[in-house]
Amino acid sequence: MTTRQRLSAERSQQLTRLLTITKTANMRALMEASELAKVIALVAVDIGKSDEMARAFPVLWPKISPQQEYYATAVDWFTNPDETVTSFDVVDMLDAGTSLDQDFMTYLKCLTELHKRRRKYGLILQRQPLPTMVQVSPRALMEYGPDFPPEALASWLTWRKFFYDLDNRSAQETGYLFEPILAAAIGGEAKSARERVVRRTDDPTKGRQVDCWKVLPDGTPLAYELKLRVTIAASGQGRFGEELSFARDCSSSGAKPILVVLDPTENDKLTGLQAAYREVGGAAYVGDAAWAHLEDEAGATMASFIERYVRVPVASVSSFERVIEGDATKRSLILQDLQARLDGNELTISLGGHQRLVERHEDQSLAADGDDDSE
């Protein structure tokens, strides 16, 4: 590698974005250059270009070459620093990867975003404070009595709220991750309401947020609504009205609306939503058809990303839920026994015969609700 004193402004900005795990007011974290280099190496392996990268970087490659696929690799392998790997090495790898596959950078962007969200959630597991009695003790009125003595009820209320907080954080991180990586994978990008690529029919001065905006080679603009599922909860009636009007707003703005729902579970809301899209010349894809559409639009390289990093994990976990007697509204899941233990700073979570240890270092600033990290 040629010795260099500084990166170009463009490369510096690109590297900063890739290395930044989180930069919220409550939490800041960066990757080391060696950690990013290992993610880049994983991309090369995934797309079948590991031999080319090994030849291009004979000294560097043995230090960063993964021995297993991403989900089978412990986070410690990524975070174990190697100071001999520099930012200039990373830039050289980016240049080499880009020359090997036109979708290399898109694949890297998506995998890096997934990795950073997982790393951030790992920090949340370590730092999320246990709830205080001020927060949970009023809830004792629902269960105070003979079943749990006060000391047991105090623990039950605390564990329950703690797990709720962790689940809420997980849902936040998944939400911030899901739409951007799918949008990037199919060659589009998210658009904010301020950009007004889709305007509200009843007030054209206001825009609509678009999960994925993509313009076809023939100039046809597509406006995607990407959803994990469509729920039937009554509390979502107002939001559902917004979802129904999205298709009409797209059509009046000259864009073709496309609905993609990964969960195949049918309900009246989903049926109505599909009809709203099709009535204005749009399209709707649900379940297997949704996955197939995403992979068709993504092309071979990014389709493999969607399959490996999104579809397989979701399907693998979902497979343990069983539909009863062919009725999709009736489902069963045999839960493994749960045990939780907090000993000093060590949290142990056991499920059946499986165990996870988390070294805890609470950060009280994370006790506040919300931690918008939608950068």
Swiss-Prot record:
Keywords: Endonuclease, Hydrolase, Nuclease, Restriction system. Its EC number is 3.1.21.4. It is an enzyme of class 3 (hydrolase). The keyword Nuclease applies. Signal peptide: none annotated. This is Type II restriction enzyme ApaLI. It catalyses: Endonucleolytic cleavage of DNA to give specific double-stranded fragments with terminal 5'-phosphates.
